[in-house]
Amino acid sequence: DLPAAHTTLTDILRRYATEPEVGDIARLYLCRLYTLRGQLFDAEEELQHATRREGEVLRQAPQLYHTAAAELDLARGEDSTALTHLTVLARSEKTALQRARLSFLIGQLLEAQGAREAAKAAFARAERTSPQPALELAAQLRTLALTTESGTGIHHLQRLARLRRYAPHRSAIYLALAEALLASDQREAARTALRQSIDSAQTLRGSATEAYTRLGLLALEDQRYV
């Protein structure tokens, strides 16, 4: 309930106007709330107010500060600055799942910037850390997508598809396998992988929908060049 949260936080600012330690924490939460609402100017203003006492908020609530700053930077499209805050958060995060999520996000941002090796390292950290098979697999798939040796990636994906641990996610694995096969110009094998993606899907959404689309595009390409 964002309106209720806003009312509570502004009330805290009024009640504790003479206690900057309390006010700074409230302002960091307000920064996050405004970022969520898309009110980025207001979010920036609250962040500046919260950090006006140099170093204090970093000592008092480092996790909250870096979270608020990273969210605002991401909302403004300032990914490089956000990476600095996210890296600090990932290093200090105590829960394995959240640490893995942060590493995965860092990997996505680095990949978007073209820093392939750094992205692979971040995805590898997410894979090692994640207690959830779905996130672990997603990190593996991103690492394989960044692997330049297509044969290695294809064999690894084929092995993943056979593992019972990833049975609920086979549709996504076969889709990634199809993309790797297409990249190495193995069209018939890619078609087989796309059909396996569809057949192994629990619902006709997500990976299965994309596999159907890719099969259709391949058929159109075949007709065009016959």
Residue positions per predicted region:
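Acidic, polar-rich low-complexity tracts and alpha-helical solenoid repeat scaffolds
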Residues: 1-226
